[in-house]
Amino acid sequence: MEIIQTTEAFKALVQDIKTSINGYKEPLAFGVCRVDMGQLNLEKTLQATYPVINWNENFGSAAIFIKALQEQGVEIDFTQSEVICNINKAFLKSCLNAFSPYSEEAYGDAHKNIQVISALYNQIATSGSKDGEFKVTFIFADEPLKSVEATYLKLYALSQAKVEIRSINLNGAFGALPNVAWSNGKPLELDYLREFEIELKLANEYPHIEFVDKFPRFLQHIIPADNTRILDTSKVRFGAQLAAGTTVMPGASYVNFNAGTTGAVMVEGRISSSAVVGAGSDIGGGASILGVLSGTDGNPITIGKNTLLGANSTCGIPLGDGCIIDGGLAVFAGTKFHINDAELIELKKVNPNTKFDNYMKGWELAGLHGLHFRQNSLNGQYVVQRSTREIKLNTDLH
């Protein structure tokens, strides 16, 4: 592409690209990434790092990327759910020519895609690059995942809150991602470590392996909000979503991918895959929220606002606002609870559309507000009462 002089000419170019390319389709998501390739299998992508991702936005930049690829002889198949293409210095130069009207404005939070293209062009011009080290990824449909690059793009979208938890298709992610050893943020093929174990150890070059997993850690890719605290990097998996003000303590805490918080939450327990916790809630030490793969029959759990899960409790049903599960208590869908007549009256006040009985199972109480799950210490009976206290976090800590 030639150098574009004005914003009007840029807009005209974008429109021409969209109308002239056969079957053109705007991507759901796209971004430029650097990939880590295998140490033995040089064609195998182990990790994709995106400085900027776009989700249902910045379609003009996408059009320029697609046109620049076309100029390099790359034809995009818009019928595919995901497309990954290698990019080079010529691609970057063509994009910069098209972005010229906006180049002086591309700093801070403005025109992030132009900043990426400019920085990468300068980096390659100075230091060069390996073949296939940099790629552009397009997702055209929210379908099961096929590649590492597209999987990482969706995980970024979750962790950067571009999309809501549980709102995108992550089927295929486990199959697409390789199981690798991680050392200082770098993925290493296990086969490579096995094959060169002797040489690496004799040369005192065997890497310090921090963990082995398909997913990296959240903080390897995401910069959290200023008032978010994560006291142990191993406690949050990449693909988790943490709202501003969330605190993840060390010890028994854990937040899985496609799970997280929608407001300031104290996390000292486990938030399993697809579980969502509302603002002001407290997940006590060792408490567990079951995930779709761990006992909920595939039904994801949402915890409402200002709810307390006591230490070492287990929650297997969705909860509304202002609920309490006492420490050590396990609440499952099939667990039967007693509610006395006086408590029934109080519970109906905050759940007016619910039909209550003296004995109800956990699934019948799912999503209701103001529930206090307890166990009678005299007879062992599980009971539900109206929660009489509002759960509030210490604002100084969040």
Swiss-Prot record:
What pathway does the annotation place this protein in?
A: Amino-acid biosynthesis; L-lysine biosynthesis via DAP pathway; LL-2,6-diaminopimelate from (S)-tetrahydrodipicolinate (succinylase route): step 1/3
Enzyme active site: 268
Q: Which residues form a coiled coil?
A: none
Q: Pfam families in the record, alphabetically? A: Hexapep_2, THDPS_M, THDPS_N
Enzyme Commission no: 2.3.1.117
- Function summary: Catalyzes the conversion of the cyclic tetrahydrodipicolinate (THDP) into the acyclic N-succinyl-L-2-amino-6-oxopimelate using succinyl-CoA.
Q: Which family does it belong to?
A: Belongs to the type 2 tetrahydrodipicolinate N-succinyltransferase family.
**Assembly notes:** Homotrimer.
Entry protein name: 2,3,4,5-tetrahydropyridine-2,6-dicarboxylate N-succinyltransferase
Give the species this sequence originates from: Sulfurimonas denitrificans (strain ATCC 33889 / DSM 1251) (Thiomicrospira denitrificans (strain ATCC 33889 / DSM 1251))
